[in-house]
């Protein structure tokens, strides 16, 4: 039986110690996945104005982080990704020809240029970086289920702490169901 690998592609200011990635990563660890954290250091450019610059810089840093990871004998590969990390992870899977299950937290529109249909996505409707209607259309075209959280920002949070906690639980239930183990 091959190994199980989970690669975590964070966002720029949303690191793996924040709720969406923290709990999903803990879940993967509890199920025997080897965790590989992609780190970018300081990325050049700002979202959304310089998205291509940020994406290209993050892409190059992710390639460097993953150059020693051997996916060839993996029985299952899961990519957890957030924001710009969703675009980087989708491109990595596409260009490396990997069979990956993707969990996209707050994907950007650029993500859908590379994404395949093997994924699930979560989005806050008050996300200032993404047009909800356009993301919905792009996800539908790729057959990627998109769960929308009314009023949630780019972290899928609001000022209401209890709403945030209940939303984290709902998101976790959905990705646990998607992973099906």
What is the role of each PLM region?
Residues 77-90:
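Gly/Ala-rich beta-loop-alpha elbow adjacent to hydrolase catalytic centers
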Residues 114-119, 142-144:
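Short, proline-enriched alpha-helix->beta-strand connector loops that line the catalytic pocket
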Residues 152-167:
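Catalytic histidine-centered segment of alpha/beta-hydrolase-like enzymes
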Residues 3-73:
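Serine-hydrolase catalytic machinery in alpha/beta-hydrolase-like enzymes
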Residues 96-109, 118:
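A conserved short beta-strand
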Residues 121-123, 127, 135:
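Short beta-strand/loop motif that positions the catalytic acidic residue
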Residues 12, 125-128, 150-153:
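Acidic beta-to-alpha connecting loop that harbors the catalytic carboxylate
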Residues 11-12, 40, 103-112, 124:
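Active-site nucleophile loop of the alpha/beta-hydrolase fold
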């Amino acid at each position: 039986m091959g190994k199980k690998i989970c690669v975590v592609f964070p966002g720029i200011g949303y690191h793996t110690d924040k709720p969406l990635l923290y709990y999903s990563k803990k879940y993967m660890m509890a199920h025997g996945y080897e965790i590989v954290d992609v780190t970018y250091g300081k990325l050049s450019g700002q979202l959304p104005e310089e998205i291509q610059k940020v994406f290209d810089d993050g892409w190059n840093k992710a390639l460097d982080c993953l150059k020693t990871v051997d996916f060839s004998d993996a029985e299952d590969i899961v990519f957890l990704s957030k924001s710009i990390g969703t675009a980087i992870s989708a491109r990595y899977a596409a260009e490396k020809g990997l069979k990956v299950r993707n969990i996209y937290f707050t994907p950007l529109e650029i993500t859908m240029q590379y994404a395949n249909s093997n994924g699930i996505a979560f989005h806050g409707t008050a996300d200032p970086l993404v047009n909800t209607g356009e993301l919905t259309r792009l996800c539908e075209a790729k057959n990627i289920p998109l769960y929308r959280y009314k009023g949630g920002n780019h972290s899928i949070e609001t000022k209401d702490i209890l709403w945030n906690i209940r939303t984290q639980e709902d998101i976790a239930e959905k990705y646990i169901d998607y992973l099906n183990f």
